[in-house]
């Protein structure tokens, strides 16, 4: 059969008309080496810093090193079956995690996937893990308190909503206990909590989750887990994931509290990644940008203005400020706060609570050292009652420490010095507190009132603990309404002062401790 030229051209035109062109531009590359969770990829000319790269087996890597001939990426998950020659492709997206109220009460991994066996999470959307912190104009000064429930902290190193307060100390000095109690204290305050566990044993994390559940605080908390068995990449990214989940509440005019436990382990994970990527090491073998690692994370904790919230929610929320308060934890070696990472984080944060192993071992718990613990912005956020009644506490402790050191060398002391030493010992005893027993403002105010106005002077040192518990039991049973109102308002005036005085004096007359 012969076709003439007209038929051939018609046939070609028909075929061209029927041809459906579906073109999809893809930037692909080839793995050239795999080692210790780091892959080097040839190709991927259009890849961006921090972009997710799709690997075989529904896994992802994050591009961290963009070099002339190759891309260095860190694998998120298992990498043992990856091999040279495998094909990978760009996604055009940066890492995002699920956010929303559906995460409250759940335990998730760095990627926001549930690991508590309670089924899928009903999230409100996704948010990038790396976000630029709010600017200066979008921020507002810190003037509302976050009550930790610890007398020693709320009176001497108060924390405000939107503040960054570092908890620093050697291992086994009660850093995690302090942070967990601060979360438990928020169960009725309306502050949402996020606990980020980095590089800890799975058994330790399970214990923390159980304690939060026992004390009714888990329903108000998101637990983000990157345990010691996870890859360095997931440990490095966990704080950013938790922060994105906290920002969801901050940007909608609510208050949130996030605990990073602890950033020393995140810095070690980042050092491991950087050295494997062949980045030049600096002091203590950390990379040059380890300061930026923590500063870009902690600057996202802020109190944002009502205008920012209104703009973010497109007018749905008006006249409400939002806040994200951060409690980063840093572990020191033999009390050395001048090491690289501790000094970095101290300079970024708005104050630090320094926990001392010598105090902890001598039975003073929480082991807060009032001499070098400081809150740079929190005093503006203190409740009136605590502010008025805690003024003499720090002074009494400072004088006591000075005199105690001096008294070791002096054989005979005058009455005034003896009185100051005795008062300091009693205040130290009074500030001791058991774990999982946060105190409301009203109870703290009553106890501080008794210390401030000399009602402890005739109480024996070993009876201080029983005096305190009996006084609180008496006040809560006989003056219930007053204690409830004081816990709500945190106010202080002549009327409240007279009422506190009457409670303590009536109780002392009773003498039932």
UniProtKB/Swiss-Prot annotation:
Cellular component, GO annotation: plasma membrane; proton-transporting ATP synthase complex
Gene3D superfamilies found in the cross-reference section: 2.40.30.20, ATP synthase alpha/beta chain, C-terminal domain, P-loop containing nucleotide triphosphate hydrolases
Keywords recorded for this protein, A-Z: ATP synthesis, ATP-binding, Cell inner membrane, Cell membrane, CF(1), Hydrogen ion transport, Ion transport, Membrane, Nucleotide-binding, Translocase, Transport
Record's bilayer topology term: Peripheral membrane protein
UniProt key word Electron transport: no
Highest taxon above the source species: Bacteria
Compartments, record wording: Cell inner membrane
Record field: catalytic activity: ATP + H2O + 4 H(+)(in) = ADP + phosphate + 5 H(+)(out)
Site entry: Required for activity: 373
GO MF terms held by the record: ADP binding; ATP binding; proton-transporting ATP synthase activity, rotational mechanism
Pfam families: ATP-synt_ab, ATP-synt_ab_C, ATP-synt_ab_N
InterPro entries linked: ATP_synth_asu-like_sf (IPR023366), ATP_synth_asu_C (IPR000793), ATP_synth_asu_C_sf (IPR038376), ATP_synth_F1_a_nt-bd_dom (IPR033732), ATP_synth_F1_asu (IPR005294), ATPase_a/bsu_AS (IPR020003), ATPase_F1/V1/A1_a/bsu_N (IPR004100), ATPase_F1/V1/A1_a/bsu_N_sf (IPR036121)
Chief place of localization: membrane
Subunit structure: F-type ATPases have 2 components, CF(1) - the catalytic core - and CF(0) - the membrane proton channel. CF(1) has five subunits: alpha(3), beta(3), gamma(1), delta(1), epsilon(1). CF(0) has three main subunits: a(1), b(2) and c(9-12). The alpha and beta chains form an alternating ring which encloses part of the gamma chain. CF(1) is attached to CF(0) by a central stalk formed by the gamma and epsilon chains, while a peripheral stalk is formed by the delta and b chains.
Protein name as annotated: ATP synthase subunit alpha
């Amino acid at each position: 059969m012969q076709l003439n030229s007209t038929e051939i051209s018609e046939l070609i035109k028909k075929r061209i008309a029927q041809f459906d062109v579906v073109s999809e531009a893809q930037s692909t590359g080839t793995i050239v080496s795999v080692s210790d969770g780091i892959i080097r990829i040839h190709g991927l000319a259009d890849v961006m810093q921090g972009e997710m790269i799709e690997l075989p087996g529904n896994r992802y890597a994050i591009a961290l090193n963009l070099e002339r001939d190759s891309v260095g990426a860190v694998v998120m998950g298992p990498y043992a079956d990856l091999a040279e020659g495998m094909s990978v492709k760009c996604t055009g997206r940066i890492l995002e995690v699920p956010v929303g109220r559906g995460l409250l009460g759940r335990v998730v991994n760095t990627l926001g996937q549930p690991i508590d066996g309670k089924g899928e999470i009903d999230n409100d959307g996704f948010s990038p893990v790396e976000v630029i912190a709010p600017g200066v104009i979008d921020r507002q000064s810190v003037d509302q308190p976050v009550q930790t429930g610890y007398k020693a902290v709320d009176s001497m190193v108060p924390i405000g909503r939107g503040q960054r307060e570092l908890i620093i100390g050697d291992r086994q000095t009660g850093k995690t206990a302090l942070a967990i109690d601060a979360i438990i204290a928020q169960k009725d305050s309306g502050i949402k909590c996020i606990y980020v566990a980095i590089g800890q044993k799975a058994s330790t994390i399970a214990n923390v989750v159980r304690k939060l559940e026992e004390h009714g605080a888990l329903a108000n908390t998101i637990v983000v887990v990157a345990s010691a068995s996870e890859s360095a990449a997931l440990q490095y990214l966990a704080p950013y994931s938790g922060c994105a989940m906290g920002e969801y509440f901050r940007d909608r005019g609510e208050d949130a509290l996030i605990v990073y436990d602890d950033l020393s382990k995140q810095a070690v994970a980042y050092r491991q990644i950087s050295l494997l990527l062949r980045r030049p090491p600096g002091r203590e073998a950390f990379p040059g940008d380890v300061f930026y690692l923590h500063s870009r994370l902690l600057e996202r904790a802020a109190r944002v203005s009502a205008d920012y919230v209104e703009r973010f929610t497109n007018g749905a929320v008006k006249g409400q400020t939002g806040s994200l308060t951060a409690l980063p934890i840093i572990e020191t070696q033999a009390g050395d706060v001048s090491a690289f990472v501790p000094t970095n984080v101290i300079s970024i944060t708005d104050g630090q609570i320094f926990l001392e192993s010598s105090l902890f071992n001598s039975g003073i718990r929480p082991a807060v050292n009032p001499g070098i613990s400081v809150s740079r912005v929190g005093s503006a956020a203190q409740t009136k009652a605590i502010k008025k009644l805690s003024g003499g506490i720090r002074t009494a402790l400072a004088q006591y420490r000075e005199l105690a050191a001096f008294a070791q060398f002096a054989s005979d002391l005058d009455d005034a010095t003896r009185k100051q030493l005795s008062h300091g010992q009693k205040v130290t005893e009074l500030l001791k507190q058991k774990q999982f027993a946060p105190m409301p403002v009203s109870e703290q105010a009553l106890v501080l009132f008794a210390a401030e106005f000399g009602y402890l002077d005739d109480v024996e040192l070993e009876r201080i603990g029983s005096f305190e518990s009996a006084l609180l039991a008496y006040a809560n049973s006989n003056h219930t309404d007053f204690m409830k109102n004081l816990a709500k308002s945190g106010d202080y005036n002549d009327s409240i002062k007279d009422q506190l005085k009457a409670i303590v004096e009536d109780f002392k007359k009773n003498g039932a401790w």
